[in-house]
Design a protein with these regions (language model features):
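Beta-rich, blade/repeat-based domains predominating
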Residues: 56-69, 100-115, 144-165, 195-213, ...
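Blade/loop signatures of beta-propeller domains
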Residues: 22-48
Length: 316
């Protein structure tokens, strides 16, 4: 996994809970504890810069991802441009695709082979594309209720295991994680609604670290849960309303905010040590959803203020 080279501006990281803490409902003072832990954590020298795409009118950029060559992939919800837009570092469009394929585009991820995957929060489709936009695999997860309220009733995110399997978070209306083989054959699913271990209230993002541990952003429970790949509960972190996760070697990045605040409120990008569960670094953010760590060691966040995606770049 890519290693993030950033400058730390302060000292020792502080966390609210270790990675092995037993599951529990976030306490009434969870926001106070979270803010104290974040305040004590070291800041990181990254500055947000809006991503502008000349000549393209985008809607909300729900999620962002990047390839090893630095290409950034934006997944946007407007009707005046293709849903998937690939841009270079200067925001110039390299290619785009996806018109007519989506109801509510939600997450976009680039797998280790450079293929581009997307989820749809309304239709339950999970689509795998070549880097040029050719459909390679189209899975209908199913199980969404009818009618679909506000177009949010299905898949949220996707993660890739070292053996080629992939895991889908099905969070809107459902509370489950599904595992598929590389060819799209469903192997198993696990999870249920609730606040206990292995239960979810909107599993919004999913990632797998180099050790094979599965991390699920249990958004409305205000925590990140950890599992093995069969769904066995390993522990949790109580770090607020986490929208996005991004694995980065020995660290996991969280795009998060206080649990009781409205969605897309100001919060933080937190760099958490996966072995200790402690915050190793922080970057303030004006709004949170999907995020990505680029091969360059810089961050992408979608959306930021005014629903515009942002680069988080090192000062020059």
């Amino acid at each position: 996994m890519r290693e993030l080279f950033l400058t730390l501006l302060a000292g020792v990281a502080v966390a609210t809970l270790s990675a092995q803490t037993p599951p529990q409902k976030p306490p009434d003072d969870a926001e106070k504890v979270l803010r104290a832990a974040v305040a004590a954590a070291p800041s990181m020298a990254l500055s947000p810069v809006p991503i502008t795409v000349p000549g393209v009118t985008m809607g909300m950029v729900s999620w962002v991802s990047s390839a090893a060559d630095g290409t950034a992939y934006l997944l946007q919800r407007g009707d005046q441009a293709d849903p998937v837009i690939a841009v270079d570092r200067n925001g110039q469009v390299l290619r785009s695709w996806g018109n007519g394929l989506y109801v509510m585009p939600h997450a976009i991820r680039v797998d280790p082979q450079g293929n581009v995957w997307t989820t749809d929060a309304a239709s339950s489709h999970v689509i795998k594309f070549s880097p040029e936009g050719r459909v390679l695999l189209d899975i209908v997860v199913g199980g969404q209720p009818t009618p679909c309220r506000n177009n949010f009733c299905s898949t949220t995110d996707i993660a890739f295991a070292a053996n080629g399997h992939f895991f889908i978070a099905d969070g809107y209306a459902n509370a489950r994680i599904l595992e598929y083989t590389a060819d799209g054959t469903k192997l198993r699913e696990w999870g249920a609604p609730g606040t206990g271990p292995g239960q979810f209230v909107l599993p919004h993002s999913i990632q797998i670290d180099p050790a094979g541990i599965v991390y699920v952003a249990d958004r409305e429970n205000g925590r990140v849960q950890r599992f093995d790949q069969t769904g066995k509960f390993l522990g949790e972190w109580i770090y607020g309303k986490t929208f996005g996760l991004e694995a980065d070697g020995a660290f996991m990045w969280l795009s998060t905010q206080p649990l009781q605040q409205p969605n897309l409120s100001p919060g933080w990008l937190l760099k958490v040590d996966t072995k200790t569960g402690k915050i190793a670094g922080k970057v303030p953010s004006a709004g949170n959803h999907g995020m990505d760590v680029m091969a360059s060691g810089e961050l992408l966040l979608g959306p930021g203020p005014n629903l515009v995606p942002q680069w988080y770049r090192r000062p020059r």
